[in-house]
Amino acid sequence: MVAGMVVIPGAAVKADDKKLIGVTMPTKDLQRWNQDGENMKKELEAAGYEVDLQYASNDVSTQVSQLENQVANGCDLLVVASIDGSSLGEPLKQAKEAGIPVISYDRLLMNSDAVTYYATFDNYKVGQKQGEYLVDALDLDNQDGPFNIELFTGDPGDNNCNFFFGGAMDVLQKYIDEGKLVVKSGQTE
């Protein structure tokens, strides 16, 4: 991911002219985002970039302001891990108009044509792993059940939740069909 950012055309580093990369993360409340942000900053600075790392405290209006400021301050590239992938249209439009490439990090920035790159994980596979964990933890291949389960997909503003859910359901559906897992609410879609 970081290596890919380092070779983006138009963002080459010159010894006398450091390029500025704006990185916005959703929150400091989760260790994962702290690690991602700090690791990205460390690697980019080691590659010769200046980095403006911001955390938005899970507040969309804060993230909008941070991105608008990064555009106004002349960032050469933006890396955005959004709180709500469909709520950043205006600052993304400003970035595009300013010719600033945008990397959507982990959470897809939706409803915008300003995204230059999308860096993420295999979210479907993550969902499969979640389903496999439940199969193993409940020993579903050896136990009769039934076990009650309710399924939650996550924030509708996070495009990844659809992939997580699809991957998990592809593993769990067999056990639901066999009656080993029971979804009392009936909500499996």
Task: For every predicted segment, state its role.
Residues 1-6:
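Bacterial N-terminal signal peptides
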Residues 7-189:
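A residue-level marker of the well-folded mature domains of exported/periplasmic proteins
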